Amino acid sequence: PWSRDQRALRARATYLHQTLGGDDWPDLSDTALKQNSDWLAPHLLGETRLSAITAEHLGAALDTILPWSRRQEIDLLLPSHFTAPSGSHVPIDYAAENGPALEIRVQELFGLDRHPSVAGGRIPLLLILLSPAHRPIQTTRDLPGFWRGSWKDVAKDLKGRYPRHVWPEDPAAAAAVTRAVVRSAVVGGAVGLAASAA
């Protein structure tokens, strides 16, 4: 019965083990943990049934394998969340099949002119860009290239489906949007910002 946070921590540690650290980081995959129960046994003293194992038991075992100092290292290398230009903190999926992935509404990335990455810039995130209705519209590992390339066609389609939203010609220079807004209000705000910057 792993908690969601425990599963996320295991995924990050396992990704480090498989991709960056080798033996410097423990393999916390299901396969590795099932092969050796020594990591859990000391935390089950007095328990006689498997059904008695709780997230607290598993958490205590994780604390032994990954003490606080090591978790801080993980947080630096592989943060659990990405802070978008919109201000949202979006969880990164390190257990995704094609490497660390981020599902995010495309509007929350307006204003970003570089591709998000982890591990000190060594690993680009797979961006799964979503519509305002949280439906996938595109995947990319090159956000600047997407803005310069296929964004024009994607934006044209989005304008037809979501006319109340603003779909800028140059999203890398636009302001990020966190929620649905009336088109005229955003356009007016953009004009005001442009005037004040001039």
Which functions belong to the PLM regions below?
Residues 1-77, 81, 122-198:
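Acidic, serine/threonine- and proline-rich low-complexity intrinsically disordered segments
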Residues 39, 91-92, 117, 147:
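Aromatic-enriched hydrophobic runs in primary sequence
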Residues 74-106:
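Amphipathic alpha-helical packing elements
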Residues 95-125, 129:
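Short, surface-exposed, low-complexity cationic segments
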